[in-house]
Amino acid sequence: MDQKEATVLFGNPKDDGFIGILGSIVQSFGGAYLYPSIEEQAAHLLYFIVKNHPFTDGNKRIGAFMFIWFLQRNKHHLKKNGEPKINDNALVAITLLVAQSEPSHKKVMVDLIVNLIKEQSGF
């Protein structure tokens, strides 16, 4: 296979983990979302896909794609000037940072991603 080419294993779900991740980011208790903001939901989506490995191959790539897709779907992907909030280099960096992080640092990783999205909003 050529470099950068996906294998036949790419994107194959191992179990129902991906469905569980999607459910977890919109989970609520007592009528309130556990992750109330779009930024928190997007950050957790990236974190859970990268760390929980719901696919046999491609978890980082799928996690990065789903993160950007989720931001786009919820109209949180652009700065006020029309540029993307998260450029390609930042996306690679935060995805690899999450992948290399210790599970005990989950809150730090999620907070970093949330702050990065908010900081790029110009608020």
Describe these PLM feature segments:
Residues 1-123:
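FIC/Doc superfamily catalytic core
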